[in-house]
């Protein structure tokens, strides 16, 4: 009996291990190499933690990753088995702590890429990273990355890493300013796991973070920043805009402009002057990003209206030989199904700005990416970096300046551009953008614009282009403003009525005083 039992047991174990191995292979094959799960503890709006989440989402889009974002307390057990390439734990508020045992257990057992940002690195994570924690107090650290340095904000306390193995990759150094001048690693990567003690929204900290995350997810690249003039509108001072674009051309600095436009009254002289100014920008080597409008009281039902509005924007501009190369919007547009599918996805080049006023139509927190997604950052946030020439970006970055509205601010802007010691990206050299609008395709490659595959030359005097006529659509979200107007009218009418009654009573009381 034993002679038969042991051989059978051996065969069974071999077969069983083979089945497990096969299942693991299938599981691995289902893993999406472009999709990550971002889990945060709290938005911590008091300390602007929601801005850090927004920046990280836009950064991940910039390195070509789709990102699903959920709050840790809302994590459902088993979510990590849904084919993510990696999971990012973002701690915005240490006091909130991780409270979901389902997430902690899944993360501990997960064998994909793992990144921890912020405080609260638990014992299991320390063991997996092969490091130990040390707490330092009352410090203003200096971040050093290569030859570039920047002073970090003052911290009351912070956890830093010690006992880091030699084979671990380090990104940036944090140096104290005391006599001993201790040095600690800023970010580390140990095999498929990474750690960052904090997340910066700007400056050298953000640049170093970007390089580390890009390496962790195997998305290494070296890019030049794109100089961008933001918040241009048809109502901007066009003379100042023209002088600014001329200055950039004479300085030999390629640039982009992010501008809004209008869908109505496009036959008026004011619109013609506006598009003529944009054509000069194109003629001087600049490129145009169509900036998304501010959202009013819209709903999911406005999806088709939004799509038509963008088609009209693009067609009206193209009729006047202004050919946008991409679409710019606040980051939340990529976290909203309606805004993303009916606006952003018309272009393969995006420029995602920091969130200001967030208005969702159908929030899904399923951020996607495009052929190229620029992380837009205020250029002023990089002024404090010493040795800027040594800075290397790891993803498409747009360094933005607000459109100046006076001669004084124009002068200041020129000085800022001249002071920044960056090598700027030239769109004419490496852009390959496409925008689908109605039945037409607008493209830009090797410095040439084309419409439906036919190369077109931009002239300062526009020629009528044979494109589909824009469809007459009602102004986007006009009902929102109409309702607001009616409410205000009724409100003031009631106030005047009450005042009239008080005046009448007062007049009567005043007369009765003299009758006595």
Model-derived segments and spans:
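Short alpha-beta junction capping motif
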Residues: 41, 81-126, 285
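Juxtamembrane/start-of-transmembrane alpha-helix segments at the extracytoplasmic/lumenal side
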Residues: 474-497
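A short, well-structured beta->alpha microelement
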Residues: 57-83, 376-387
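A glycine-centered loop/beta-turn motif at secondary-structure junctions
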Residues: 34-35, 83-84, 112-113, 130-140, ...
């Amino acid at each position: 009996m034993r002679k038969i039992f042991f051989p059978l047991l051996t065969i069974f174990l071999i077969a069983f291990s083979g089945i497990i191995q096969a299942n693991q292979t299938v599981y691995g094959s289902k893993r999406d190499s472009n999709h990550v799960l971002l889990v945060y503890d709290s938005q911590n709006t008091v300390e602007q933690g929601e801005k850090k989440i927004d920046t990280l989402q836009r950064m991940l889009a910039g390195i070509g990753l789709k990102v699903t974002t959920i709050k840790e307390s809302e994590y459902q057990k088993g979510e990590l088995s849904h084919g993510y390439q990696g999971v990012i734990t973002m701690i915005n508020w240490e006091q909130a702590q991780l409270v979901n045992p389902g997430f902690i257990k899944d993360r501990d057992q997960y064998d994909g890429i793992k990144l921890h940002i912020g405080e609260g690195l638990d014992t299991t994570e320390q063991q997996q990273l092969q490091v130990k924690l040390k707490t330092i107090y009352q410090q203003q650290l200096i971040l050093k990355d290569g030859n570039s340095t920047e002073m970090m904000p003052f911290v009351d306390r912070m956890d830093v890493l010690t006992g880091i193995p030699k084979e671990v990759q380090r990104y940036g150094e944090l140096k104290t300013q005391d006599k001993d001048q201790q040095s600690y690693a800023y970010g580390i990567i140990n095999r498929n796991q990474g750690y960052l003690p904090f997340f910066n929204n700007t400056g050298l900290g953000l640049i170093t973070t970007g390089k580390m995350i890009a390496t962790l997810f195997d998305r290494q690249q070296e890019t030049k920043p794109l100089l961008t003039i933001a918040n241009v509108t048809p109502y901007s001072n066009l003379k100042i805009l023209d002088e600014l674009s001329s200055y950039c051309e004479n300085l030999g600095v390629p640039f982009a402009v992010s501008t809004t436009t209008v869908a109505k009254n496009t036959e008026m002289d004011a619109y013609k002057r506006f598009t003529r100014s944009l054509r000069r920008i194109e003629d001087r080597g600049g490129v145009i990003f169509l900036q998304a409008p501010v959202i009013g009281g819209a709903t999911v039902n406005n999806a088709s209206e939004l799509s038509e509005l963008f088609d009209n924007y693009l067609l009206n501009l193209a009729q006047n030989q202004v050919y946008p190369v991409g679409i710019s919007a606040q980051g939340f547009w990529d976290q909203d199904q309606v805004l993303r599918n009916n606006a952003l996805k018309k272009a393969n080049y995006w420029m995602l700005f920091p969130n200001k006023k967030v208005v969702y139509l159908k929030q899904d927190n399923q951020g996607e990416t495009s052929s190229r997604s620029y992380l837009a950052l205020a250029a002023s946030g990089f002024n404090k970096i010493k040795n800027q020439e040594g800075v290397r970006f790891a993803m498409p970055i747009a360094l933005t300046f607000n459109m100046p509205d006076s001669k004084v601010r124009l002068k200041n802007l020129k000085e800022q551009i001249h002071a920044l010691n960056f090598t700027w990206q030239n769109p004419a050299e490496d852009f390959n953008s496409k925008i689908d609008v109605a039945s037409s395709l607008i493209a830009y490659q090797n410095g040439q614009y084309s419409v439906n595959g036919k190369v077109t030359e931009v002239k300062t005097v526009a020629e009528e282009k044979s494109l589909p006529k824009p469809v007459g659509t009602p102004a986007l979200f006009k009902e929102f403003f109409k309702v607001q107007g009616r409410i205000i009218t009724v409100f003031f009418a009631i106030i005047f009525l009450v005042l009239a009654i008080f005046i009448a009573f007062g007049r009567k009381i005043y007369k009765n005083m003299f009758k006595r």
